[in-house]
């Protein structure tokens, strides 16, 4: 499964918003954001 995200920096956090799915997460670093994206996708699609 491929889930696409729009990723942006909002002056304090890296944010990711699902393009076709209602998923949103954030992280202080890109590495933390990637971990949070994986977790959010696993929770959204059990």
Task: Annotate each PLM feature.
Residues 1, 35-46:
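A short N-terminal helical cap/helix-turn-helix that marks the beginning
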Residues 8-17:
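Short aromatic-glycine-(Arg/Gly/Cys) micro-motifs in beta-strand/loop hairpins
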Residues 21-31:
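A short, exposed loop/beta-hairpin motif centered on an aromatic-Gly-Thr core
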């Amino acid at each position: 499964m491929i889930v696409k995200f729009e990723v942006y920096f909002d002056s304090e956090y890296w944010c990711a918003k699902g393009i076709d799915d209602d998923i949103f997460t954030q992280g202080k670093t890109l590495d933390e954001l990637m971990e949070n994206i994986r977790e959010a996708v696993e929770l959204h699609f059990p």
